[in-house]
Swiss-Prot record:
Pfam families noted in UniProt: zf-CCCH (PF00642)
Gene Ontology biological process terms in this record: nuclear mRNA surveillance of meiosis-specific transcripts; nuclear mRNA surveillance of spliceosomal pre-mRNA splicing
Intracellular or extracellular location(s): Nucleus
Region (Disordered): 60-95, 347-376
Entry-linked Gene3D superfamilies: Zinc finger, CCCH-type
Compositional bias ranges of the Polar residues kind: 349-369
Listed name of the protein: Zinc finger CCCH domain-containing protein C337.12
Zinc finger (C3H1-type): 202-228, 229-256, 257-283, 284-312
PROSITE patterns noted in UniProt: ZF_C3H1 (PS50103)
InterPro entries, A to Z: Znf_CCCH, Znf_CCCH_sf
Keyword terms: Coiled coil, Metal-binding, Nucleus, Repeat, Zinc, Zinc-finger
Amino acid sequence: MNEQQLLENIASLAGAINQYKNEKEPTQVLDAAKANKNTRSYPYSVSRNYSFILNKSNRSKSTAASPPYVIPSTSSNADDANKEPEKQSTSDYVSRKNRHMQLIKKNILEHDLQARKANLESYRAKLEKEYKTLAENKIQQRLSDGTKQLVTIDGLQYITGVSDTKWLEFVSAKGQCPKYLYWNNKSYLLKKKRFLKEVGNSPSAVYCRYYNANGICGKGAACRFVHEPTRKTICPKFLNGRCNKAEDCNLSHELDPRRIPACRYFLLGKCNNPNCRYVHIHYSENAPICFEFAKYGFCELGTSCKNQHILQCTDYAMFGSCNNPQCSLYHGAVSADVPEQTEAPISKTAGSINPEDSGSEIGSNSLESNLDFISV
């Protein structure tokens, strides 16, 4: 083949190619226009159905080791052999419901939970540190004028006045504000949120005197004083063997020496009742009357107290007069002519207290009248 024939063959082949291109061009333009017309202008939404999550490393190993297709077998042995791997594979996954229901591997879930817990702890520590710094700055700003001071009571911080300590403000970053406390020989009771007010000089001043004397309080849970069942006054009828209410009685039936008065007959050396329920104790001749027991009907020291546990007005005993017209405590002196007690058994009949019964007080100094001394 010479050079001229080769050029003719090339020309004919190029013409055939150009003719083929010209025939296919209109259809390609139509297909492109159709494709542009059907193109989505927004992405596909995320599926809220079940999603299957696999570990990539385990997936590549499992796909390389096992064939892509499993030939079914009609024999029962083949079915059992195929079921065992399925149980093993599904036991490695657990379901988790976060935003979507997910099926996830156990090791991946444990790793995610540990990372989430670590992040939460670090975030909480950061917030606590910021809150503590902010609280300290506020405290320093309030103490800058010099009229207030910062005190620490039982590990908690309070702000109070330098000269006037009538109020305590709870400012501690940690802990909970107590309902009452005793500090600097003063009792404080929670009045408002984070504010405690001085209510007296005795630790017993925070307890409700109505509740202690009667066993109940009309204000109930709304009462701002403390209702402590262990500080209820002992039932005077129970001391004289005349209370038939037993467990239904609102007052206490426990012989606790911290709330039982001393036997006046024993103090005079004239108590002959072996079943006397009053406290038999000797006091010194010049022992004063216990203010805690006389006013609140309760003394923490009990029989170890050096003062007399008698329900008598302390003001009248010390100064000879009482300025409280509503005071219901005994105001007379103890008479030396008190007759000796008889050894008659304690009566179990319900009724009013008889001064002649064993263990009872005489005249206006009866225990039942002296215990009803509450006046606020």
